[in-house]
């Protein structure tokens, strides 16, 4: 069944009492994120099939072919025996779209009907593939008091927070219409950081759309300053019971102020004060060398490491799927 009711969609995903994981659901399955994808020119289809909720993004391939991608989903809200069979049938035949070459999912749930989700997916005909989203993340339980959260951090991180306070670093969180006035500040700092570290970015419009998120899935821009000088910035997303640390950057030459560390600490405190239960650092990697510094930075704040099952493909058209993967290997 394709869903078209925003309140019902977010309500079922957020409020349903069956919570299979402390990191589910992800904002990538929110109604607002689907609408953001539409603004970027992609078609979105939202399914509720036997209690499996999936906001699926239609991705274009060559020769008029497509595939569907379900980031951090489907969200499991029931465990009926035939759920996965019915789920696949929904993508295989529908009046609103042509049959895709394959379906790619990245569920966060670890189990289904008491069995490891990996076993369930393999039995249903899915095959493992390279993850799109980071498989691992760090999550801080905000129900703990601030002192307990602070004590779980590395000594150098606690020192950096105290040093930033003594040196006069301030952090402001902007929401609603106020985000428009500071987005360019965030963008300059963010791009300076990515150029400095030779990191890839999406087009500017993507970050602008993220910054405009409002409602049940909303965003805030945080700016850290020394006096009137902005020296670090970040975008956070808020959905369900979690706050997500999504994008961040800092200016060169201001290292002694420890602004990125202090900004993140203030964001943790802000999320706790606002009533969120979890703070999600949004991705770490022990294998990717390019992620080593950011992973070490995030891990210095403590938190529990949680790993998801990764990405899985179900293939509807094997010849085209083979050509697609062969082309990806050749192109790199």
Annotate each predicted stretch with a short phrase.
Residues 96, 122, 165, 272, ...:
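Anion (oxyanion) recognition and catalysis
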Residues 103-104, 172, 280-281:
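Short catalytic-loop micro-motif centered on adjacent basic/acidic residues
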Residues 2-64, 107-112, 118-133, 137-256:
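A conserved beta-strand-loop-helix scaffold within acyl/acetyltransferase catalytic domains
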Residues 75-77, 108-111, 283-288:
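Short histidine/acidic/glycine/proline-rich micro-motifs that form metal-
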Residues 86-93, 208-317, 321-322:
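Aromatic (often tryptophan-rich) hydrophobic motifs at membrane interfaces
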């Amino acid at each position: 069944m394709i869903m078209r009711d925003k309140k019902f969609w977010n309500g079922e995903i957020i409020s349903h009492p069956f919570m299979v994981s402390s990191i589910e659901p992800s904002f990538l399955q929110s109604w607002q994120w689907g609408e953001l994808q539409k603004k970027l020119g992609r078609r979105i289809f939202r399914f509720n099939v036997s209690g499996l909720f999936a906001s699926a993004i239609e991705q274009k391939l060559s020769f008029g072919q497509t595939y569907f991608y379900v980031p951090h989903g489907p969200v499991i809200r029931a465990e009926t025996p035939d759920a996965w069979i019915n789920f696949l049938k929904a993508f295989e035949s529908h009046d609103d779209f042509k049959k895709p070459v394959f379906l790619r999912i990245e569920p966060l749930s670890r189990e289904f009907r008491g069995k490891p989700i990996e076993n369930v997916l393999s039995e249903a005909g899915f095959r493992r593939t390279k993850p799109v989203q980071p498989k691992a993340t760090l999550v801080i339980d905000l129900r703990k008091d601030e002192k307990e959260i602070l004590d779980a951090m590395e000594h150098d991180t606690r020192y950096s927070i105290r040093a930033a306070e003594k040196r006069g670093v301030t952090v402001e969180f902007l929401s609603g219409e106020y985000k428009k006035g500071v987005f360019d500040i965030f963008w300059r700092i963010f791009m300076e950081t990515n150029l400095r570290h030779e990191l890839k970015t999406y087009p500017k419009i993507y970050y602008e759309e993220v910054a405009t998120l409002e409602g049940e899935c909303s965003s805030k821009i945080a700016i850290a300053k020394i006096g009137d000088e902005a020296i670090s910035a970040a975008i956070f997303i808020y959905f369900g019971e979690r706050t997500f640390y999504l994008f961040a950057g800092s200016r060169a030459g201001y290292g002694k102020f420890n602004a990125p560390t202090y900004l993140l600490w203030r964001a943790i405190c802000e999320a706790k004060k606002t009533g969120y239960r979890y703070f999600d650092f949004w991705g770490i990697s022990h294998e990717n060398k390019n992620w080593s510094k950011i992973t070490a930075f995030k891990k210095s704040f403590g938190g529990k490491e949680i790993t998801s099952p990764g990405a899985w493909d179900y293939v509807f058209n094997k010849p085209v799927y083979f050509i697609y993967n062969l082309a990806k290997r050749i192109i790199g």
